[in-house]
Every structure is written in structure tokens, then in C-alpha cells.
């Protein structure tokens, strides 16, 4: 497809065009050589074709079918040349391969002068369609120029076809778009769809002016509907008021006619004759009743007119304060369902207002007599509607009350939960504070202990350094210090008379540089010996207590043996003791022992009590100033032995053998217990009753 004129088309390198041009040049040269000879007529010449084919070429060469460039350059000379050559291009359109045969010579029907003129001007005006021509002069067009024109026409035809295809596609797309928009308009006009759908459709397309226009039209329609509804509402209001006034007027007219009739009847009765007194009285009563009825009706009419006037003033004031323009401007952005809901709400409010007005006007209307039955019958229908509304409102109020109670219960439950959570929170906070305080105390203790450890470690280091210095300065001091703290275990009383300077007497006189070290070593030796002495003293006290207990049990055993040998089954004699001393010793058997009645436990208790009582009696008789502390310790041990019951004999079995000082402690005992000190055997108390009193 070529996009230029005839010359660029020839320059593109088309083989067919170049071949045609070469043939035409060769033919022109041959014609110039054979100038005097007439050109031979070709059997396939387009000039010898039928004249009926000219119409088809003329139809191609018309101004409407040619491109704009061809129309601008169309001149009468070209038209004359086109008409002078009938059928010149019909075969070119039908068979493009016959171009080299179609223009081999000048047609035979042409005059000689024209042929000479064409031959003279032919080399100068070649490719006139591409190079241009001088207007007003006849131009002979060669087949190359005609070929260029045909190519241009084909190009224009192809362009027009492509334009037609493009327009068809555009038309199809526009039809699809129109159908889609029609569907969208139908969806928008559908009242079942919501406002969100309309807004999303309006927001999806940036060029949604048609949607906006449609919405505006809908808004206008809805505004008109709202105006119509307002008009109907106002008409209903005015009709209601006028009907009430009309009814009152009709009632007044009827009453007036009735009064007039009664007056005429009264006058006729007076003219006809005298009536009895009863009839006169009834007529007077009727007149009074009618007068009172007229007065009440006039009052009610006056009240109704005043009410009508006040309602008109209220309506004017409402209309002045709330203009319809602002309402319509507010309603413009509303959707159809929302407007319908608003209309329903307004109708409900209007019905409520009418019901309230009717309730307010009921006491006023109660004054007329019962002859207004027709007017009351007219108001019965809205009262039924009002009753329905009241029932519905009562049901709604009942539901709201139930919901309120349920919500109050839920609120109370939530309050309780909140209180519980707050209490738990307070408890947790207290626990957290306690934990923090404990943590702080623990940290303080740790810090104190760390400080003590640091001080002790520092002291230990100092002592170690001092010891090293002492060892370096005077190595003889440690050897004598080791010899001193090795006393014999039998020298108990000599430890009390240990001279404080005995460690220093055996040592040589200290030299001046190590005198402090010697003093420290002596102090350490004294401290060690004092600790050993205290330990031994405590051990001696415990040994004495153990010896006393052993002696008591031995004496008891000997007594039991003697008594058993004398009289089997008699109770052992019990020495009466002080109540304060023996108060912890006698214990009543437990309820379990009494319930079971086992004689073994009773015998064990009796044995322990008797042994301790005997020991206390002996201690009272043999009490001296030297053994007061020993007696107190034995009382404490006896009290602990009574609480332990059967656990005391294992304690006695675990005690070590008495020291050599044991016989000295038992020396003041009476003569009947002399045999108790001869044996060193440890007696277990619970085993005695089993041997003496087998069950």
C-alpha cells in the first residue's frame, strides 16, 4: 500500500512499474525514428473498445469518487482528455498486465495535427500527473501517469475501506455502550436497589455526567412527588377543619329551623286556644333547653374558630421558619428509599399531631347535647385508627420497658463483674506490693550479708597477713601455743584457776617488734580454752541429770521388786509430794486408752508417776545448797519425761556412761537406795511391766 503520489510510488523500486517505464521509453524512441510512418493499430488498444464502457470510467472519474487532491487539480482540459479517450482505462482496471500493449502507438481516430502536437509535447510533459502541468494547455497523459492515478485511487479506496471498518467498529462499540448504559439506567431506576449501588456506579466512571443527569431527574421527580404529598396532606388538614365547621353550621341551621318551627307551633297553639298548664310548662322547659343548646353551640363555634385561627398562625409560622427551598436542597441528595421513609415518618408525625389535637378538643366537644349523633358518627372511624395506633404504641412502650429492664440487669451484672475485677486488681496490687517489699527486704539482707562477708573477708585477710608476719618474725610462738590448749580431761577444776598470764610465763620475754602478736596469740589461746571449759561444764550438767534419772529408775525398780516379793498385786506405796512439784507428773490416761482399757498403758503410766514422785521425795529430803541447780534440772527432765511417756527410756538408753563425778552427786541419797548405785546398767522403763505383769 503506497502513501504518496505517483512519483514516490515509482521510486519505491517496484519491478512492474520500472519495466513499464522502460518499455515506454523504448517505444518513444522508436516512434521518433519512424516519425513519418503511421503508427500501427494494436488489436488490444483501449481506443478501439466499445463505447458503452466509457460510462464506467466516467463513473470512476467523477468528483465524488475522486480524492480531494484529484478534485482540486481537475480542469476542463483533463475532463476533455478523459472524454476524448473512450474506454482508455477500462481494460487497465480489468487486466493490469496489458499496459505495455495498450499504449504502443497513437490511436488511429486522432487527427494528424493533434498527433503532431502530442508528439512534439510528449517528451516535455511526461508524467504530468506527478510533475504538474500548465493550465489552459492540452496535455497528453501517458500510461505511467494514468497508472499513478489508478494507484492513488486504489489507495484512497483502501483508506476509505479502512475508515469504513473503523467506523463500523466504532458504531458497534457505541451500540454496546448504549446497551450497557440502558441496562445501568434500568438498574438505577429500579427502586429495589439501594443508594450504595447508585453511588458506586457514579464513582466508578470519571465521565459519569449521564449518571448525574439521571439522578438529577430522579431527584426532580421525587421533589415533585414530595410536593404532591405535601399538597395532599395540607388538603386533608383543611378538609378536616372545614368539615368540622360545616358540620357545626349544618347543626346550627337545623337547630334554628327547629326553634323556628317550635315558635310557629307555639304561636299557632296560642291562636287556636288556651292550652292546659302542663303543656305550657313543657313548652317553657323545651324553650329553655333549646336556648341552652344554642348557647353551648355558639360557644363551641367560637372556640373552633379560635382554634382554627391559631392553627393557621402556627402553620404560617412553621412555613416561614422552615422554607421549602432548604428542604428541597436537603432532599436533593437523598435517594428514593430514604425519601419514602421520610414521607412515612412525616405521615406518622401528622397522625400523632392529629390524635393529640383530637384529644385536646374532646372536652370542648363534650358540651353539645346528644343531638350531634351524626357528627360523632363521622369521628368514629379515625378514633378506631387512633385506638390501633395507641395499642401499637403501648406494645412498643411495653417492649421498650422490657428491653430497659433487661439492659438494667445486664448493667448490674457488668457492674458486679467490674467490682469483682477491681477487687481482684486491688488484691493483686497488694500482693505485688508485699512481694516488692519482701524483695526489697531480701535485697537489703543480701546487701547487709554481703557487707558482713566483705568485712569478714577483709578481717580474715588482715588476720592471715598478721599471722604470716608473726610466723616470719617469731616462729617459736605457734609451737608453745599448740602445747598450751591440750589439758587433760580430768582437770576440770584447774581450768577455772587458769591464770591469764600462764601462757606468757613459759615464753621468753617478747621482743619489742612482736609483742602485739604474742598478745593476740595468747588471747586466742584463752578464748579457745574458755570455749572448751564451757562445753565441758554443759556436758557435766547433762551427765548429772542423766545420772539422777537413772538413779530414780533404779530405785523404783528395786522398790517394785521388794513389793512384788512381799505382796503380789498390791499397789506400790506412793509418797505424797507437793502439788506444785508433782502437778505436771500425774496425767489422766487419754480417752482412747480409757476406751480400750489396755492394762499395759495404765501400768506404764503408774510406773513413771511413782518413779518421779519417789525421786522428788528423795530430792526434798537430800536437798542441799550445792545441788539446787541439779534438782531444778531434774524437775525439768522429769516434766519432759512425763510428757514423753514411753519415749523417755530410749533417751536414757542413748545417754553415755556416767562420769566419775556421778557417785559424788548421788552421795546424799538415803540408805535404802544404796544398792541403786552399784550397777551401771541402763533400764528401759516400758519393758518392766511386761516382765513383772505378763498379760
Curated annotation (Swiss-Prot):
Specify the protein name: IQ domain-containing protein E
Protein topology in the membrane: Peripheral membrane protein
Please give the residue positions where the record annotates the modification Phosphoserine: 322
Q: Which GO terms describe its biological process?
A: limb morphogenesis
Q: Where in the cell is it found?
A: Cell projection, Cilium membrane
Origin species: Homo sapiens
Q: Which disease is it linked to?
A: Polydactyly, postaxial, A7: A form of postaxial polydactyly, a condition characterized by the occurrence of supernumerary digits in the upper and/or lower extremities. In postaxial polydactyly type A, the extra digit is well-formed and articulates with the fifth or a sixth metacarpal/metatarsal. PAPA7 is an autosomal recessive condition characterized by postaxial polydactyly restricted to the feet.
Residue ranges annotated as coiled coil are: 157-264, 292-358, 387-477
Q: Which UniProt keywords apply?
A: Cell membrane, Cell projection, Coiled coil, Membrane, Phosphoprotein, Repeat
Q: Give positions of region: Disordered.
A: 29-55, 357-390, 465-521, 564-599, 618-695
Amino acid at each position: 500500500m503506497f502513501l504518496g503520489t505517483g512519483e514516490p510510488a515509482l521510486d519505491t523500486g517496484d519491478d512492474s512499474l520500472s519495466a513499464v517505464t522502460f518499455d515506454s521509453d523504448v517505444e518513444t524512441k522508436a516512434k521518433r525514428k519512424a516519425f513519418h510512418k503511421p503508427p500501427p493499430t494494436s488489436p488490444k488498444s483501449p481506443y478501439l473498445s466499445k463505447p458503452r464502457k466509457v460510462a464506467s470510467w466516467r463513473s470512476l472519474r467523477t468528483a465524488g469518487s475522486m480524492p480531494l487532491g484529484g478534485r482540486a487539480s481537475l480542469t476542463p482540459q483533463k475532463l476533455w482528455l478523459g472524454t476524448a479517450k473512450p474506454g482508455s482505462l477500462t481494460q487497465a482496471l480489468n487486466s493490469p498486465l496489458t499496459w505495455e500493449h495498450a499504449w504502443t502507438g497513437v490511436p488511429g481516430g486522432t487527427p494528424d495535427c493533434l498527433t503532431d502536437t502530442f508528439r512534439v509535447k510528449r517528451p516535455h510533459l511526461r508524467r504530468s500527473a506527478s510533475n504538474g502541468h500548465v493550465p489552459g494547455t492540452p496535455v497528453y497523459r501517458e500510461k505511467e501517469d494514468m497508472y499513478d492515478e489508478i494507484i492513488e485511487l486504489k489507495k484512497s479506496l483502501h483508506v476509505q475501506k479502512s475508515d469504513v471498518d473503523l467506523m463500523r467498529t466504532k458504531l458497534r462499540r457505541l451500540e454496546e455502550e448504549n446497551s450497557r448504559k440502558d441496562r445501568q439506567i434500568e438498574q438505577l431506576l429500579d427502586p429495589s436497589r439501594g443508594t450504595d449501588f447508585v453511588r458506586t456506579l457514579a464513582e466508578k466512571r470519571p465521565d459519569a455526567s449521564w449518571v448525574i443527569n439521571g439522578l438529577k431527574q430522579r431527584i426532580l421527580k421525587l421533589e415533585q412527588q414530595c410536593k404532591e404529598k405535601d399538597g395532599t396532606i395540607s388538603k386533608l388538614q383543611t378538609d378536616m377543619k372545614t368539615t368540622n365547621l360545616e358540620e357545626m353550621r349544618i347543626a346550627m341551621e337545623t337547630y334554628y329551623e327547629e326553634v323556628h318551627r317550635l315558635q310557629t307551633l307555639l304561636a299557632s297553639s296560642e291562636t287556636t286556644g288556651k292550652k292546659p298548664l302542663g303543656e305550657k310548662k313543657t313548652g317553657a322547659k323545651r324553650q329553655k333547653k333549646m336556648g341552652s343548646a344554642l348557647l353551648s353551640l355558639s360557644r363551641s363555634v367560637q372556640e373552633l374558630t379560635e382554634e382554627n385561627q391559631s392553627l393557621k398562625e402556627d402553620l404560617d409560622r412553621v412555613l416561614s421558619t422552615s422554607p421549602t427551598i432548604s428542604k428541597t436542597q436537603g432532599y436533593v441528595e437523598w435517594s428514593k428509599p430514604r425519601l419514602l421513609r421520610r414521607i412515612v415518618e412525616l405521615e406518622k408525625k401528622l397522625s400523632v399531631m392529629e390524635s393529640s389535637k383530637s384529644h385536646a378538643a374532646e372536652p370542648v366537644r363534650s358540651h353539645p347535647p346528644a343531638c350531634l349523633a351524626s357528627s360523632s358518627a363521622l369521628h368514629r372511624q379515625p378514633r378506631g385508627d387512633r385506638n390501633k395506633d395507641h395499642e401499637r404504641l403501648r406494645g412498643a412502650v411495653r417492649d421498650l420497658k422490657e428491653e430497659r429492664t433487661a439492659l438494667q440487669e445486664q448493667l448490674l451484672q457488668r457492674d458486679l463483674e467490674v467490682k469483682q475485677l477491681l477487687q481482684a486488681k486491688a488484691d493483686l496490687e497488694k500482693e505485688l506490693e508485699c512481694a516488692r517489699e519482701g524483695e526489697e527486704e531480701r535485697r537489703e539482707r543480701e546487701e547487709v550479708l554481703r557487707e558482713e562477708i566483705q568485712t569478714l573477708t577483709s578481717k580474715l585477710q588482715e588476720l592471715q597477713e598478721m599471722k604470716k608476719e608473726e610466723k616470719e618474725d617469731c616462729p617459736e610462738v605457734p609451737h608453745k601455743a599448740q602445747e598450751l590448749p591440750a589439758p587433760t580431761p580430768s582437770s576440770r577444776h584447774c581450768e577455772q584457776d587458769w591464770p591469764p598470764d600462764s601462757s606468757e610465763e613459759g615464753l621468753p620475754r617478747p621482743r619489742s617488734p612482736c609483742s602485739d602478736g604474742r598478745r593476740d596469740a595468747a588471747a586466742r589461746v584463752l578464748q579457745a580454752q574458755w570455749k572448751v571449759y564451757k562445753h565441758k561444764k554443759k556436758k557435766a550438767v547433762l551427765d548429772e541429770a542423766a545420772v539422777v534419772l537413772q538413779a530414780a529408775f533404779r530405785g523404783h525398780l528395786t522398790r517394785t521388786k521388794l513389793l512384788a516379793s512381799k505382796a503380789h498385786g498390791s499397789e506400790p506405796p506412793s509418797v505424797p509430794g507437793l502439788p506444785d512439784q508433782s502437778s505436771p507428773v500425774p496425767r489422766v490416761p487419754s480417752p482412747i486408752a480409757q476406751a480400750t482399757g489396755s492394762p499395759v498403758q495404765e501400768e506404764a503410766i503408774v510406773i513413771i508417776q511413782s518413779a518421779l514422785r519417789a525421786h522428788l521425795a528423795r530430792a526434798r529430803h537430800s536437798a542441799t545448797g550445792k545441788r539446787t541447780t541439779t534438782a531444778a534440772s531434774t524437775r525439768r527432765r522429769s516434766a519432759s519425761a512425763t510428757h514423753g511417756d514411753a519415749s523417755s527410756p530410749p533417751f536414757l538408753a542413748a545417754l553415755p556412761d556416767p562420769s566419775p563425778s556421778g557417785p559424788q552427786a548421788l552421795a546424799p541419797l538415803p540408805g535404802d537406795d544404796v544398792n541403786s548405785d552399784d550397777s551401771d546398767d541402763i533400764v528401759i522403763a516400758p519393758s518392766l511391766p511386761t516382765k513383772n505383769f505378763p498379760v
